[in-house]
């Protein structure tokens, strides 16, 4: 495919802006440092050397005759020497007025300098993120399936980190000063909530048994294999020797498969639904297991191990209950408070409650990841039906966009961290860590799938098992735990953090780039038509819906939960929303070229003979107002007078207007589709 001139223009513009911004950043940093140094020199304590043996030659020969004047001893010195108050300000200045004014001016100047520096750094970060988005766009446009977006962004971060490290080291130091607590507070909840909110619930709960087996027992197996393995090779001198506690701490850290990296790759490839849901569920739920194992390592006594195992059950159940309760509470608010006319308020409620569930879980020492994940699932099941049609259609895209930005920043942070990290590398430790990680993954996947196939009606094929083994990517969760861990031997902290970071990058590059070729070799279905941002966390295909759900749960849900927590929406509104969604989906696929949704041919005419046909001159609007919909048949008659019915789908094609009665009904809630 030939590159358009617009691509080259965008790249040139981006590079020019980047160079100018980097230069301005360096200038700002130099000025702020010089200003800070000058302020420190000007704010030193005033001193006066009083020499009782002054011979007039200006030399101070006797150091014992020197008296240091400071604000603390100034008053005592004045009294002892006998200087009157009128001469005090001449000798020392007004310590109460001029000193305070100088301090205020210096403080104000420092604040302005810091503000300029912060604004420049933020601009640099935004510019780097813009470059990351352009890279993702180029990968999709050029149709490079074997290079996931995550790998490309990490590589982009490494290249920028190298440039900054040698020329503008202050910039990379500011960027990588991002604390692990900020990752857990801002980035992770956004990604996990969007995953739960857009998850296909039927696939998830139909496979909850295998998911729990992988998430709990598989994580414990990885913890034991890696911990024992690292300790044994260190004991025999094959690699650097870690203590038993440090070895198992590393095992608990590396046992966490990261949902962000896994989701980014699997969603881009649109893999088989069973593979997607098993790996997704494991990566989400095993965080609680990893945290439990990590806390056990802190104290290895038998009593604490038993307590930690019991606490793991409490944490898991409590996290699920908290997420469900918060979602049901929001569902009641959306049902009984009529805020459908204010879509922005509905979206704000959803964002606030999702974060409240996450931070409240952290305050209660339970898993915020599990809480916000099940909050998203429950909200989609009940609260979403009380949202206005406009919010239903826009909130999903908003959450997908926020998750995409968070993922991009995270992968970029990985790349920059590699160049700013204080490395203490041991080849033996790294090599054995990779070997034991892959071995532990194989031990936890293949025997467990063999046992599950003995009891499950839906078998896990061998090709899916191989793909699950290959999908054990590590990511930000493991790296954040390594930053939090403090070894009893201080110099081992750097080894553990370096080794964890290298294992994370290795799995992202090797397993990430090898996923697509492996799926092709195994013959597992993939699709590139709905890649990246347009399809982040896309629900599973309707063909994968299974009909073996428990009838007891269905009847209980239909009889109690749905009437309690869902707003009753008339069927006509639901039908209109479904038609609108189909129009949006088809409008994106009608212009599809070479199986890529971001490519359009301006000269190609649309010859699709589907039920809904779109031309370039078609102006399509949908009018929905659920407040004026009634179930009575009197409002749906065809007597030519439909002024009270605001549920018509009006299609305007410049010269003609189609409606039920041939009239033009005005509606304030018009949603432009094109």
UniProtKB/Swiss-Prot annotation:
The keyword rRNA-binding does not apply. It is found in: Membrane. Disruption phenotype: Impaired polarity. Starved mutant cells differentiate, and in response to the chemoattractant cAMP retain directional sensing; however, they cannot attain a polarized morphology, but instead extend mislocalized pseudopodia around the cell and exhibit decreased velocity. In response to chemoattractant, mutant cells lack a leading edge localization of F-actin and have significantly attenuated de novo F-actin polymerization but increased abundance of membrane-associated phosphatidylinositol 3,4,5-trisphosphate. However, they retain directional sensing. LY294002, an inhibitor of the catalytic subunit of PI3-kinase, blocks NHE1-dependent (but not NHE1-independent) increase in intracellular pH in response to cAMP. Regulation of intracellular pH homeostasis in response to cAMP, which is essential for chemotaxis. Necessary for F-actin localization and the kinetics of actin polymerization during chemotaxis and cell polarity but not for directional sensing. NCBIfam families: b_cpa1 (TIGR00840). This is Sodium/hydrogen exchanger 1. It comes from Dictyostelium discoideum. The gene is nhe1.
């Amino acid at each position: 495919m030939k590159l358009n001139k617009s691509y080259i223009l965008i790249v040139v513009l981006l590079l020019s802006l980047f160079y100018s911004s980097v230069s301005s950043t360096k200038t700002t940093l130099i000025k702020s440092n010089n200003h800070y140094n000058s302020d420190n020199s000007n704010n030193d304590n005033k001193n006066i050397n009083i020499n009782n043996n002054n011979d007039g030659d200006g030399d101070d020969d006797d150091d014992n005759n020197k008296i240091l004047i400071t604000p603390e001893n100034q008053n005592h010195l004045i009294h002892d020497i006998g200087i009157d108050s009128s001469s005090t300000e001449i000798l020392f200045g007004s310590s109460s007025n001029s000193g305070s004014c100088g301090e205020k001016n210096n403080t104000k100047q420092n604040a302005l300098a810091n503000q300029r520096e912060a604004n420049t750094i933020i601009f640099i970060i935004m510019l780097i993120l813009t470059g990351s988005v352009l890279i993702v766009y180029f990968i999709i446009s050029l149709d490079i399936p074997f290079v996931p977006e995550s790998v490309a962004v990490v590589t982009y971060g490494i290249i920028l980190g190298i440039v900054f490290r040698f020329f503008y080291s202050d910039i990379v130091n500011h960027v990588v000063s991002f604390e692990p607590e900020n990752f857990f507070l801002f980035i992770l909840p956004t990604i996990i909530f969007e995953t739960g909110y857009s998850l296909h619930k039927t696939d998830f709960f139909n496979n909850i048994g295998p998911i729990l087996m992988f998430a709990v027992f598989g994580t414990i197996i990885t913890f034991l294999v890696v911990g024992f393995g690292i300790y044994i090779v260190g004991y025999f001198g094959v690699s650097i020797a870690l203590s038993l506690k440090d070895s198992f701490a590393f095992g608990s850290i590396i046992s966490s498969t990261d949902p962000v990296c896994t989701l980014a790759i699997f969603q881009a490839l649109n893999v088989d639904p069973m593979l997607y849901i098993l790996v997704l569920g494991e990566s989400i739920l095993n965080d609680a297991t990893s945290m439990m194992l990590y806390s056990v390592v802190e104290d290895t006594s038998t009593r604490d191990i038993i307590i930690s195992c019991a606490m793991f059950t409490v944490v898991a159940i409590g996290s699920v209950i908290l997420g469900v309760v918060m979602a049901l509470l929001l569902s009641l608010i959306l049902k009984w408070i009529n805020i459908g006319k204010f879509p922005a308020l509905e979206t704000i409620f959803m964002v606030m409650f999702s974060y409240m569930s996450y931070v409240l879980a952290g305050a209660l020492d339970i898993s915020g990841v599990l809480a916000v994940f099940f909050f998203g699932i429950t909200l989609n099941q009940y609260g979403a039906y009380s949202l206005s049609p406009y919010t239903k259609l826009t909130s999903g895209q908003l959450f997908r966009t926020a998750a995409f930005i968070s993922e991009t920043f995270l992968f970029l942070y990985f790349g920059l961290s590699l160049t700013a990290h204080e490395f203490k590398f041991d080849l033996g430790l790294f090599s054995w860590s990779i070997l034991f990680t892959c071995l532990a993954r194989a031990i936890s996947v293949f025997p467990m799938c063999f046992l599950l196939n003995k009891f499950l009606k839906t078998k896990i094929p061998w090709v899916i098992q191989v793909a699950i083994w290959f999908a054990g990517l590590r990511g930000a969760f493991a790296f954040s735990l390594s930053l939090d861990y403090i070894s009893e031997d201080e110099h081992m902290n750097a080894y553990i953090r370096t080794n964890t970071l290298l294992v994370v990058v290795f799995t992202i590059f090797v397993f990430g780039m090898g996923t697509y070729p492996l799926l092709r070799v195994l013959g597992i279905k993939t699709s590139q038509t709905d890649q990246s941002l347009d399809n982040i966390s896309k629900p599973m295909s309707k063909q994968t819906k299974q009909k073996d759900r428990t009838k007891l749960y269905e009847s209980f849900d239909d009889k109690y939960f749905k009437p309690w927590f869902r707003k009753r929406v008339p069927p006509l509104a639901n039908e209109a929303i479904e038609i609108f969604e189909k129009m949006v989906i088809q409008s994106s696929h009608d212009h599809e070229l070479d199986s890529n949704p971001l490519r359009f041919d301006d000269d190609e005419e649309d010859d699709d003979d589907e039920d809904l046909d779109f031309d370039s001159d078609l102006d399509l609007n949908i009018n929905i107002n659920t407040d004026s919909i009634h179930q009575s048949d009197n409002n749906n008659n065809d007597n030519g007078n439909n002024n009270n019915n605001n549920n018509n789908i009006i299609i305007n094609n410049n010269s003609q207007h189609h409606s039920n009665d041939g009239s033009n009904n005005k509606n304030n809630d018009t949603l432009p589709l094109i």
